[in-house]
Protein backbone atom coordinates (compact mmCIF):
# COMPACT_ATOMS: atom_id res chain seq x y z
CA UNK A 1 0.00 0.00 0.00
CA UNK A 2 1.20 3.50 -0.70
CA UNK A 3 -0.12 7.04 -0.86
CA UNK A 4 -0.68 7.58 -4.58
CA UNK A 5 -2.22 11.05 -4.67
CA UNK A 6 -2.83 14.08 -2.49
CA UNK A 7 -5.50 16.51 -3.64
CA UNK A 8 -5.57 19.78 -1.71
CA UNK A 9 -8.22 22.47 -2.13
CA UNK A 10 -8.38 25.57 0.08
CA UNK A 11 -6.07 24.15 2.74
CA UNK A 12 -3.80 26.78 4.33
CA UNK A 13 -1.61 28.25 1.56
CA UNK A 14 -3.15 26.04 -1.16
CA UNK A 15 -6.03 28.19 -2.42
CA UNK A 16 -6.33 26.45 -5.78
CA UNK A 17 -6.86 22.75 -6.35
CA UNK A 18 -3.43 21.16 -6.19
CA UNK A 19 -2.81 17.52 -7.05
CA UNK A 20 0.40 15.77 -6.05
CA UNK A 21 1.05 12.40 -7.70
CA UNK A 22 3.34 10.13 -5.69
CA UNK A 23 5.22 6.96 -6.60
CA UNK A 24 5.88 3.87 -4.46
CA UNK A 25 8.85 4.12 -2.13
CA UNK A 26 10.20 7.00 -0.13
CA UNK A 27 9.15 10.54 -1.04
CA UNK A 28 10.87 13.74 0.04
CA UNK A 29 9.22 17.15 -0.21
CA UNK A 30 11.85 19.83 -0.70
CA UNK A 31 11.75 23.51 -1.56
CA UNK A 32 12.51 27.00 -0.28
CA UNK A 33 11.16 28.35 2.98
CA UNK A 34 7.51 29.35 2.76
CA UNK A 35 6.58 27.28 -0.30
CA UNK A 36 4.14 25.00 1.58
CA UNK A 37 6.14 21.86 2.39
CA UNK A 38 4.93 21.72 5.99
CA UNK A 39 1.38 22.43 4.83
CA UNK A 40 1.46 19.26 2.71
CA UNK A 41 2.39 17.18 5.75
CA UNK A 42 -0.21 19.03 7.83
CA UNK A 43 -2.83 18.21 5.18
CA UNK A 44 -2.03 14.50 5.39
CA UNK A 45 -2.11 14.46 9.18
CA UNK A 46 -5.37 16.47 9.16
CA UNK A 47 -7.16 13.95 6.91
CA UNK A 48 -5.89 11.08 9.03
CA UNK A 49 -7.56 12.57 12.08
CA UNK A 50 -5.42 15.25 13.68
CA UNK A 51 -7.77 17.09 16.06
CA UNK A 52 -5.32 19.59 17.55
CA UNK A 53 -5.20 22.93 15.74
CA UNK A 54 -1.97 23.63 17.62
CA UNK A 55 -0.38 20.48 16.15
CA UNK A 56 -1.28 21.91 12.73
CA UNK A 57 0.32 25.24 13.68
CA UNK A 58 -2.99 27.08 14.11
CA UNK A 59 -5.19 28.50 16.85
CA UNK A 60 -8.45 26.90 15.69
CA UNK A 61 -9.42 24.32 13.09
CA UNK A 62 -10.75 27.11 10.86
CA UNK A 63 -7.11 28.22 10.48
CA UNK A 64 -6.61 25.38 7.99
CA UNK A 65 -8.97 27.16 5.56
CA UNK A 66 -7.29 29.51 3.08
CA UNK A 67 -7.73 32.94 4.65
CA UNK A 68 -7.20 35.06 1.57
CA UNK A 69 -4.60 37.57 0.43
CA UNK A 70 -4.61 41.13 -0.84
CA UNK A 71 -5.64 39.81 -4.26
CA UNK A 72 -7.71 36.71 -3.38
CA UNK A 73 -10.80 36.22 -1.28
CA UNK A 74 -10.85 33.87 1.70
CA UNK A 75 -12.43 30.51 0.91
CA UNK A 76 -15.44 29.09 2.78
CA UNK A 77 -14.13 25.50 2.97
CA UNK A 78 -11.03 23.39 2.91
CA UNK A 79 -10.82 19.84 1.58
CA UNK A 80 -8.03 17.31 1.25
CA UNK A 81 -8.30 13.89 -0.40
CA UNK A 82 -5.69 11.16 0.11
CA UNK A 83 -5.79 8.27 -2.36
CA UNK A 84 -4.06 5.07 -1.32
CA UNK A 85 -3.48 2.24 -3.79
CA UNK A 86 -2.52 -1.43 -3.64
CA UNK A 87 -4.31 -1.56 -0.32
CA UNK A 88 -6.58 -4.62 -0.40
CA UNK A 89 -4.31 -6.66 1.88
CA UNK A 90 -3.22 -3.97 4.36
CA UNK A 91 -6.66 -2.41 4.76
CA UNK A 92 -8.67 -5.59 4.38
CA UNK A 93 -10.89 -4.08 1.69
CA UNK A 94 -12.11 -5.29 -1.68
CA UNK A 95 -10.85 -2.04 -3.23
CA UNK A 96 -7.47 -1.58 -4.88
CA UNK A 97 -7.74 2.17 -4.21
CA UNK A 98 -9.19 3.89 -1.18
CA UNK A 99 -9.78 7.66 -1.06
CA UNK A 100 -10.03 9.23 2.38
CA UNK A 101 -11.03 12.88 2.61
CA UNK A 102 -11.85 15.54 5.14
CA UNK A 103 -13.71 18.80 4.66
CA UNK A 104 -14.10 21.68 7.09
CA UNK A 105 -16.11 24.88 6.72
CA UNK A 106 -15.88 28.26 8.38
CA UNK A 107 -19.16 27.61 10.20
CA UNK A 108 -17.42 24.80 12.09
CA UNK A 109 -18.70 21.84 10.11
CA UNK A 110 -16.22 19.01 9.68
CA UNK A 111 -16.82 15.88 7.61
CA UNK A 112 -14.86 12.74 6.76
CA UNK A 113 -15.38 10.54 3.72
CA UNK A 114 -14.12 7.12 2.67
CA UNK A 115 -14.50 6.51 -1.08
CA UNK A 116 -16.86 9.52 -1.23
CA UNK A 117 -19.20 8.05 1.40
CA UNK A 118 -19.76 9.89 4.65
CA UNK A 119 -17.65 8.49 7.49
CA UNK A 120 -16.69 9.24 11.07
CA UNK A 121 -13.24 9.92 12.47
CA UNK A 122 -13.53 6.55 14.19
CA UNK A 123 -14.05 4.88 10.78
CA UNK A 124 -10.91 6.49 9.38
CA UNK A 125 -8.90 5.48 12.45
CA UNK A 126 -10.25 1.92 12.27
CA UNK A 127 -9.43 1.69 8.55
CA UNK A 128 -5.76 2.44 9.19
CA UNK A 129 -5.41 0.62 12.53
CA UNK A 130 -2.23 -1.48 12.69
CA UNK A 131 -0.91 -0.17 9.35
CA UNK A 132 1.57 2.42 10.60
CA UNK A 133 -0.49 5.11 8.87
CA UNK A 134 -2.17 7.71 11.03
CA UNK A 135 -1.99 11.25 12.37
CA UNK A 136 1.04 10.25 14.48
CA UNK A 137 3.24 8.11 12.30
CA UNK A 138 6.86 7.24 11.74
CA UNK A 139 6.04 7.56 8.04
CA UNK A 140 6.29 11.35 8.23
CA UNK A 141 9.32 13.28 9.39
CA UNK A 142 8.24 16.68 10.63
CA UNK A 143 10.30 19.80 11.27
CA UNK A 144 12.58 19.21 14.22
CA UNK A 145 12.71 15.44 13.76
CA UNK A 146 15.61 15.75 11.30
CA UNK A 147 17.75 17.47 13.96
CA UNK A 148 16.73 14.82 16.46
CA UNK A 149 17.79 12.05 14.07
CA UNK A 150 21.07 13.75 13.20
CA UNK A 151 21.96 13.93 16.88
CA UNK A 152 21.78 10.12 17.24
CA UNK A 153 24.64 7.72 16.63
CA UNK A 154 24.99 5.75 13.38
CA UNK A 155 23.40 2.59 14.78
CA UNK A 156 20.34 4.46 16.06
CA UNK A 157 19.98 6.30 12.72
CA UNK A 158 20.11 3.00 10.83
CA UNK A 159 17.36 1.58 13.04
CA UNK A 160 15.20 4.67 12.48
CA UNK A 161 15.57 4.49 8.69
CA UNK A 162 14.94 0.74 8.64
CA UNK A 163 11.73 1.25 10.62
CA UNK A 164 10.55 3.97 8.26
CA UNK A 165 11.39 2.02 5.13
CA UNK A 166 10.01 -1.25 6.54
CA UNK A 167 13.38 -2.95 6.03
CA UNK A 168 14.40 -5.66 8.46
CA UNK A 169 17.86 -5.34 10.06
CA UNK A 170 20.42 -7.97 9.09
PLM feature spans:
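Gly/Lys-enriched N-terminal cap/neck module of very large, oligomeric protein machines
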Residues: 2-170
Amino acid sequence: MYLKQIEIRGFKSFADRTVLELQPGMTAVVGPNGCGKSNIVDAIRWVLGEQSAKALRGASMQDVIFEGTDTRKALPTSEVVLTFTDCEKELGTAFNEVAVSRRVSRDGGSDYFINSKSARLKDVQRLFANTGVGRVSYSFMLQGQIDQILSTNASERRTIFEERSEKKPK
